[in-house]
A protein has these predicted regions:
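Buried hydrophobic residues that stabilize the cores of well-folded domains
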Residues: 19-159
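Sec-dependent N-terminal signal peptides
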Residues: 4-14
Length: 159
């Protein structure tokens, strides 16, 4: 009897977990299909002059708003040999998903015409906690909650 109860509990946990991921995927798809966002762009000058953050190929931050609610942040960081693009997705002002991609931008022959995707990692969140991480490639460990909050603050403060 205890064995059956344990199996039942385990199955209900797995089903609930899968439903959470499906709901997040649907919300991300909905955000990506949304048209007519109000977009706020923060150029590289802000990062260099205000935050004292200089990178070889610059930074750019974009906030995507619908009905005055932040739905997505896109953060581009250009380093010497690669670019990192991190996209943060929100529902009800809560981080739900982060897509972190790294592209090679320079080869031994110089700059690549089209940057080559090196990896794309997916991070799923619920109630400000990481619930699932899908890595194509092991990468640096980032505190995406903290980074998200810092970027939201930058969007709020930038005039």
């Amino acid at each position: 009897m205890k064995k059956h109860l344990l199996i039942l509990l385990l199955l209900s946990f797995i089903i609930g977990f899968s439903q959470n991921l499906d709901l997040i995927r649907k919300e991300v798809e909905k955000i990506n299909n949304t048209k007519n966002f109000k977009i706020k762009t923060i150029p590289n000058d802000y990062f260099v002059d205000i935050k004292n953050e200089a990178t070889d190929n610059g930074q750019e931050l974009k906030g995507y708003y619908k009905n005055n609610q932040l739905k997505k942040i896109s953060h581009f960081v250009g380093l010497s040999a690669w670019n990192i693009v991190t996209e943060y997705y929100y529902k009800d002002n809560q981080l739900i998903f982060v897509l972190n991609s790294k592209y090679q931008s320079v080869s031994e022959n110089g700059f690549l015409e089209k940057p080559k995707l090196l990896y794309r990692n997916r991070n799923y969140f619920k109630n400000n906690k990481l619930i699932k991480k899908i890595e194509e490639e092991t990468s640096e460990i980032f505190d995406f909650i903290k980074l998200s909050n810092e970027l939201k603050k930058d969007l709020k403060n930038y005039k």
